[in-house]
Every structure is written in C-alpha cells, then in structure tokens.
Amino acid sequence: MSLTIIERRNTKKELAANFNLAGVTLEQAAQDLATMPEHVEAVLQLQVDQIEEPWILRNYLNKQLAAQGKTPLPYSRLQGDPAVHWFLNTDLIAKGRLN
C-alpha cells in the first residue's frame, strides 16, 4: 500500500500527535521497541525500510495511551486490524519491535 503525499503528511501528523499525547520520549520508545531513538524518529517521519513499522509504532502508542486511560487520536490510514491488509506481515507487527 502506498500513500499519497497528503496521506503521508496526515499520517505523520497523526503519529506525532499520539506520540506527544502518550508523553513518551524517543529514548523510552526506542528502549521499549528494541531499537535506537533515531529509528523511532525515522518511523515517525515514515522513513521506513518495512511497511509494517508505522503499524508497530501505532500499536505501541495505543498501548501506552490505554495504560494511561487515554484514547488515541484517530488515524486516517493506520486504522483497524492490520491483519485485514494482505500485504502486511502480521507476525512482524505482533512482535512489537522495530529492530
């Protein structure tokens, strides 16, 4: 699945908004996701090697927000269960790691 320029812009804004709402640092997210802070920042900017990475970050942020009793801000493209998208590796997403 490829995103249009507008969809990419919106998705980056949505990830950033939920990242800020979760109140985590790049360092904390990187540690939790078994990667480096620079990699988390790259995923926030949709500069990814694997198309599953934004889904992994989305799931992580949603869990962080749920643990705080907060509701994630809506996503326009990263919606629902990634398993419905045949092109995504759901096993990779389920691992919850960005390494």
Locations of the language-model features?
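Short alpha-helical "recognition helix" segments of helix-turn-helix
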Residues: 25-31
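Residues within the helices of the helix-turn-helix
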Residues: 27, 38, 59
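Short, basic-rich loop-to-helix N-cap that marks the start of a DNA-contacting helix
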Residues: 47-59
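Recognition helix of helix-turn-helix/homeodomain-like DNA-binding domains
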Residues: 35-50
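Residues in the recognition helix of alpha-helical DNA-binding motifs
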Residues: 18, 32, 43
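Helix-turn-helix/homeodomain-like alpha-helical modules used for DNA recognition
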Residues: 70, 74-99
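A short, Lys/Arg-rich alpha-helix, primarily the initiator
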Residues: 1-21, 59, 63-71
